[in-house]
Structures are given as structure tokens and as C-alpha cells.
Amino acid sequence: MKILVTGGLGAVGAPLVRELRRRGYEVWVADRVHAEGPNYLRCDVGVYRQVERLFEDRTYDVVYHLAAEFGRRNGEDFYETLWQSNAIGVKNMLRMQEDLGFRMVFTSSSEVYGDYQGEMTEDVMEKNPIRQLNDYAITKWVNEQQIMNSADRFGTETVRVRLFNTYGPGEPYSEYRSVICQFIYRALHDLPYTVYLDHHRSSTYIDDTVRTLANIAENFKPGEVYNISGDEYHDIKTLSDMILDILGKDDDLVEYVKFEAHNTRDKLASNEKAKRDLDHQCTVTLEEGLPRTIAWQKEVYGRE
């Protein structure tokens, strides 16, 4: 099987590429940066001409479309790039899919659940009026609508996955990255950070996420949507406390605030469907995964 992974150098894309290659697939990688490596193609998915080049002289059985601008704050500060990469990027990929007929796996986000309160099963959008709370969430929901419309009009075959708070080694720090990445980096460097006391998450270790993503290639059910999440539902303060405890630091630099506007407060995920169809397994607990992630950041950023 020949597979293309867009965003294949990213925090989720790179380990997914390794997992797919470990299974013996022929994997091509597309990303926006200049890089070297086997079967690497530079591409900004928001530019149609560059997307076309991914398919010159080669075909793929499955495209994992991960390339996107990530995160709520990033989407507010760089909204032009967010909409170009996410909305136009998916439309560009769908145009190629409509012409060439490959199957696609699309990574959406738990942010699409917006202001929904309760257990997040994949079908809640069909039963409840939901308001997405920020531009990043809106683009991901737009992407899902684009994909469903293409399937209805052209018969394209896509599986959508909604990732929940994926964390682990390999995610470089920036102020726009995920909460665990930010907490670890800022605690390591004695920098202040904010903990939102009324926010809860279902965190997923990267190895568990990519193993389930890779399983889709051989268990492909067109039109399906899956939550990929961990089994541990926790508040954000628990994450901060665990990280500080591992590092042997106090919380003097932590500001505690009740909640953050324009952000989904509670993400209680149901992952039963992914367990049933994709053999999703939550094998790494926070107690195991956080020390591994901290050790990686210490090595990368030279902190002890």
C-alpha cells in the first residue's frame, strides 16, 4: 500500500510516518518546510499548484491529511494563514481526491464539540445545536462539512478522526502549542503560566494516537468519524500538579484562573467506537507519559 502523509514532519505526523513505515507501507511525506529524507515532498497545502505536484507521476492508495494550522490562539493571531491552510487546504485535497479516487483520513479536532456539555460521542452534532467557540474550531468543523459534501456529491471516501489532547515526545514548544507541552516547557524554564481551574481534558499519549491512526488504513470504513482519546478524564490543574511534582518545583509562578473564554471547557470523550472498529488501546497513562515527555524536552532544550 502506498500512503501520503501531509504534515508528515509535525508532532503527530512524524511518529505516524514512522509507524506506517514500520508496518511495511510505502510512505511519502509532504510538509511546508525545506527538508531532506526518503520520499519527501515540500508542499503548502493551501496552494493548489503545490498540491497538484504531490500527485505528479505517482498515485496513492490512502492520504492521511494532517497538514493544518493548529490551535485557538494561533488561529486568532494568524487567522489568514489558518483559513488558507485549513479551509482552502482541505478543499484543494478534495479536488484531487474527486479526480483521482484515493481514500483519505482527515484529522479533525475535539474543538469541534464547542460549547457542548456532556460526554462527547461522535454523533452529538446530529442531535444538538453546538456553537464552535473559536476560529480554529470553526475551520475544523468547516473541513468536516467540506468532506461530507464531497462524499455526497462525488462519492469520495474519507474517515474523519477527532483528536483529544494528544501529547508526548516530539512536540516542540511555542506559545501556540498544546497545554502539556506549554506547562512542561514553562515549568522547566521557570516561566509563569496560567491554569484554568474549570477546564477538563481527556489526554492521549502520542504512541496510542498514531497506532490507532495507522490502523485505519486496514480498517477503512468510508464516511465514519472517530474520537481518538485517552481513558483518563482530568482537570487541568492535575496536569500542572503532576508536572511540577516530577520536576520538584512549587507553583509560585502559576496563576490560577477559573476559566478561559472561547475555549471548550470540558472534553469528556467517548472512545468506544474507535476501540470497537480500530482496536484503539490506551496503553500509556499520564503517570507514565508525562515523565517521558519531560525527559524529551530536557534533552532537546538542555535543561536539567
Which residues does each PLM region occupy?
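NAD(P)-dependent short-chain dehydrogenase/reductase
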Residues: 118, 145-202, 206-215, 241-244
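N-terminal Rossmann NAD(P)H-binding glycine-rich loop of SDR-like oxidoreductase domains
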Residues: 3-23
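SDR active-site strand-loop-helix element
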Residues: 6, 30, 63-69, 104-110, ...
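Rossmann-fold cofactor-recognition segment
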Residues: 36-47
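Active-site helix of classical SDR
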Residues: 139-142
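NAD(P)H-binding glycine-rich loop region in Rossmannoid oxidoreductase-like domains
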Residues: 45-85
